[in-house]
Swiss-Prot record:
<keyword id="KW-0687">Ribonucleoprotein</keyword>
<dbReference type="GO" id="GO:0006412">
    <property type="term" value="P:translation"/>
</dbReference>
<comment type="similarity">
    <text>Belongs to the universal ribosomal protein uS9 family.</text>
</comment>
<dbReference type="Pfam" id="PF00380">
    <property type="entry name" value="Ribosomal_S9"/>
</dbReference>
<dbReference type="InterPro" id="IPR020574">
    <property type="entry name" value="Ribosomal_uS9_CS"/>
</dbReference>
<dbReference type="InterPro" id="IPR020568">
    <property type="entry name" value="Ribosomal_Su5_D2-typ_SF"/>
</dbReference>
<dbReference type="GO" id="GO:0003735">
    <property type="term" value="F:structural constituent of ribosome"/>
</dbReference>
<dbReference type="GO" id="GO:0022627">
    <property type="term" value="C:cytosolic small ribosomal subunit"/>
</dbReference>
<dbReference type="InterPro" id="IPR000754">
    <property type="entry name" value="Ribosomal_uS9"/>
</dbReference>
<keyword id="KW-0689">Ribosomal protein</keyword>
<dbReference type="InterPro" id="IPR023035">
    <property type="entry name" value="Ribosomal_uS9_bac/plastid"/>
</dbReference>
<dbReference type="GO" id="GO:0003723">
    <property type="term" value="F:RNA binding"/>
</dbReference>
<dbReference type="InterPro" id="IPR014721">
    <property type="entry name" value="Ribsml_uS5_D2-typ_fold_subgr"/>
</dbReference>
<protein>
    <recommendedName>
        <fullName>Small ribosomal subunit protein uS9</fullName>
    </recommendedName>
</protein>
Amino acid sequence: MTQAVEYKGLGRRKSSVARVIIRPGKGEFHINKRPAREYLTSDLYLKDANQPFVLTETFQKFDTFVNVKGGGLNGQAGAIRLGIARALLHASPDYRTKLKAEGMLTRDARIKERKKPGLRAARRARQFSKR
């Protein structure tokens, strides 16, 4: 029994985590067992998620299967983008220069700041009145 070649990548963004599997194929793209266009309703999110394929000119060469949890659609699209970029590196290390130059391999570390005690939000304080 021969097992199909597959490359895996993990991407995180804000509170979203995406597990990406790419296999040589004809360009299928599924997110949580649904077509990507159906899951990521906005073209902006879909374009963001597909960016590593566009940069490396490999969109029609791989079938992509993504399992993503947490956060909103923007964070999920960013997590998928990082996961795809990392999976492409496993497929071919030659893509590193293109992906690195565009910042695709850098995890965006910006996350929501925690609420502090005595304040209404992370930095928002109650309104102050001198008199």
